[in-house]
Amino acid sequence: MERTFLAVKPDGVQRALVGEIIRRFEAKGFKLVGLKLMNVSKDLAEQHYGEHKEKPFFPGLVQFITSGPVVAMVWEGKGVVASARKIIGATNPLNSEPGTIRGDYGVDIGRNIIHGSDAVETAQREIALWFQPAELVSWEPTLTSWIYE
């Protein structure tokens, strides 16, 4: 089953949106297999955003993600990477549709509440970066047969 990585950024944690974000993914039928509240080290932030290292906004990304607690999560389900991106909305909240997390709660691109992996390969890399294998729990919800054929 496909997995994706999500992180509620410091602004989402401070605004008490963690429960609402989890609710949306559970309501969709996805399974939470990893969850932790953590302070992100500068090293982890630089690895996570490594593809942007040469861009002028890189220092601001690192500074922001390390400015407060983050809730890191791994979700599992059919097509979860693409579905999560739709639930999250466009990177710039001003371009996000109402009904998406960023469309409903975001105002500024630099404070866009949540990160979600953009591809299956990216999700695999990010999950390995943020979680040890023992931190991921395999389990079977009783409602699975009501969601998937």
Curated annotation (Swiss-Prot):
Q: Which UniProt keywords apply?
A: ATP-binding, Cytoplasm, Kinase, Magnesium, Metal-binding, Nucleotide metabolism, Nucleotide-binding, Phosphoprotein, Transferase
Tell me what reaction this enzyme catalyses: a 2'-deoxyribonucleoside 5'-diphosphate + ATP = a 2'-deoxyribonucleoside 5'-triphosphate + ADP; a ribonucleoside 5'-diphosphate + ATP = a ribonucleoside 5'-triphosphate + ADP
Q: List the GO biological process terms.
A: CTP biosynthetic process; GTP biosynthetic process; UTP biosynthetic process
Q: Which Gene3D superfamilies match?
A: Nucleoside diphosphate kinase-like domain (3.30.70.141)
Residues that, per the record, bind ATP: K9, F57, R85, T91, R102, N112
Active site per database record = H115 (pros-phosphohistidine intermediate)
A single Gene Ontology CC annotation of this entry is: cytoplasm
Q: Quote the PROSITE patterns the UniProt record gives.
A: NDPK, NDPK_LIKE
List localization entries. Answer: Cytoplasm
Q: Where is the signal peptide?
A: none
- Nucleotide-binding: present as a keyword of the record? yes
- Main location per UniProt? cytoplasm
**What is the top-level taxon of the source organism?**
Bacteria
> Which InterPro entries does UniProt cross-reference here?
NDK-like_dom, NDK-like_dom_sf, Nucleoside_diP_kinase, Nucleoside_diP_kinase_AS
A single GO molecular function, which one?
Answer: ATP binding
- EC numbers on record: 2.7.4.6
Q: Which cofactor does it need?
A: Mg(2+)
Q: Which CDD domains match?
A: NDPk_I
Q: Which family does it belong to?
A: Belongs to the NDK family.
Record text on subunit structure and interactions: Homotetramer.
Primary role: Major role in the synthesis of nucleoside triphosphates other than ATP. The ATP gamma phosphate is transferred to the NDP beta phosphate via a ping-pong mechanism, using a phosphorylated active-site intermediate.
Q: What is this protein called?
A: Nucleoside diphosphate kinase
Q: Which organism is it from?
A: Cyanothece sp. (strain PCC 7425 / ATCC 29141)
